[in-house]
Amino acid sequence: MNNNFDAIVIGAGHAGVEAAFALAKSNNKVALITFDLSKITMMPCNPSIGGPAKGIITREIDALGGIQGYYSDLAMIQIKMLNDSKGPAVRAIRAQIDKEKYSKLIREDLQKNSNITLIEAGVYEIKADKKVFKSVVLSTGEEIFAKVCVLTTGTYMNSQILRGSSVTVSGPDGQKTTNKISESLKKLGFELQRFKTGTPARIYKSSIDFSKVEKEILDTNDLNFSNRSNKKLNQQVSCYLTYTNEKTHEIILNNLDKSSMYSGLIKGTGPRYCPSIEDKVVRFSDRNRHQVFFEPETLDETIIYLNGLSTSMPEDIQMQFLKTIPGLENLKIQKYGYAIEYDALNSLDLKHSLETKVIKNFFAAGQINGTSGYEEAAAQGLIAGINAALKLKNKKPLVLKRSDAYIGVLIDDLVIKGTKEPYRMLTSRAEYRLLLRHDNSDYRLSKYGYKLGLISKDEYSQIQKKYKNINSKINYLSKKYLSTNSNIAKKYNIKEATSYLKLLLRPEINPKDILKNYKYQNELLIKIKLEGYIKKQKQDASRMKNLEKIKIPNNINYDKVLNLASEAKDKLKIIKPETIAQAYRISGINPSDIQMLIFHLKTYKKYDN
């Protein structure tokens, strides 16, 4: 086997494959290392992609030339728009995915890629020379060398599975794990955190009594994550809804001491926005029921994922409380739920490029950085892969701003604020969310994907044509006036000549009366109806960009900044922001601290105008 590559990617989950494909598209020779080739981009938790904010991230990945959206479209068995009745800033797609097909399609494309070498092995050591990445040593004893490395180990690093008092050294779904990488990272100077997440039981569909649950009825639609996919679902696979009840809660409360979480066995910090059923019963004691969704894991629907019932209870207690839930009285369990603890990096050790501050040419992406979710992981993998490729060419990294993308918000939060619990992207985290919509992801980011060579000239041209068409249509509508004798005027009792554009702003007007079957109706209506609000957010973003222009030198001595609060000094020394805008976003830094910092930089003339 060739032992010399341009890049090494450790881990072939959602982050790892994005990094590998991005590096390979830049014509680099990539070694992609994973424990088990049959588990590439497996979905150890929910069999879905997207959701609030997360669906927009997947759209952004696609606009940049990443793969998650494209393969999600090919493997989806259900797709819907969430928050459709709410404002456009919070709308997002969510799709149920055939998890086996998704993994298979990506594995096959990796195997076909001449720039990617798949290596089935563990990594036992990461080596650096004078704080610069050098090589990795495999479980086989072989040493692999490269100029750059992207670490994407997910929840596999020093991980253990917990059910009740049972603790098993294992990765997700009984996969291999390793403590060797954790040991190696500590020796290199990295600080590690201990995090926890969990997953519910899977059951056989044949054991469910569907007469006692609610069926989700969905219409066919033409939704897609990817501009490169034309797949349309002719038939949606249904999910089902049922509820826990007081008997369920009674069994859980009577056995709390047997839960790994509540017995004190789990030391890691769990996700705030994806609590276990034990947490929900304890924290929301006033509620006598909680939702449970039955989600098929594949197109054949043999196995059902019980969304809402993540647990670390022992197997016998799981069986007891599950049987109290309507529809599950005679259930057969394929796999019991569990909690998993794992090591993660301190994300404050990362740059915005996702290169680590500790070791040069060494990048990290995905759950190892303290995030949760396939979408957050894939986004980081793509950015790390892009920037590793740019590093190989001695070019500046791609750093997306908070006003550019949810991906920019995600990475900025990790790098500037850090996280003490598994980080999940929410629309509320984005201050410019009206700019970061589902419908304009391609408009916002395709220019970067094209410039980087990750999307083709034809794809980019099609996106440009789309928005040119929308602008031309708006211009046409502003100049075309409705005759008072027309059928539309009579229908809405319009007495004076009015431009079609102004008519579209009236709530009583049905847009189809004017736009007919115009292809980009949704995008056009959002643009004209929210023009004022969008303009204001752009102005806010522009003001913040001015602060981004004020650079903070690497060699700044914060002890010499007059009247800077002690807390501000401590945090600035640890986080080492590169601009005033980044310093402004650090928790505990006050406006007065920022003023003193700007005054100091102006006084000593060490900032870039």
Swiss-Prot record:
It comes from Mycoplasmopsis synoviae (strain 53) (Mycoplasma synoviae). Belongs to the MnmG family. GO terms for biological process: tRNA methylation; tRNA wobble uridine modification. Homodimer. Heterotetramer of two MnmE and two MnmG subunits. NAD(+) binds at residues 270-284. Its cofactor is FAD. NAD-binding protein involved in the addition of a carboxymethylaminomethyl (cmnm) group at the wobble position (U34) of certain tRNAs, forming tRNA-cmnm(5)s(2)U34. Keywords: Cytoplasm, FAD, Flavoprotein, NAD, tRNA processing. One of its GO terms (cellular component) is cytosol. The gene is mnmG. This is tRNA uridine 5-carboxymethylaminomethyl modification enzyme MnmG. InterPro entries: FAD/NAD-bd_sf, GIDA_C_N, MnmG, MnmG-rel, MnmG-rel_CS, MnmG_C, MnmG_C_subdom, MnmG_C_subdom_sf. NCBIfam families: mnmG_gidA. It is found in: Cytoplasm. PROSITE patterns: GIDA_1 (PS01280), GIDA_2 (PS01281). FAD binds at G11, A12, G13, H14, A15, G16, V123, T178, Q367. GO terms for molecular function: flavin adenine dinucleotide binding.
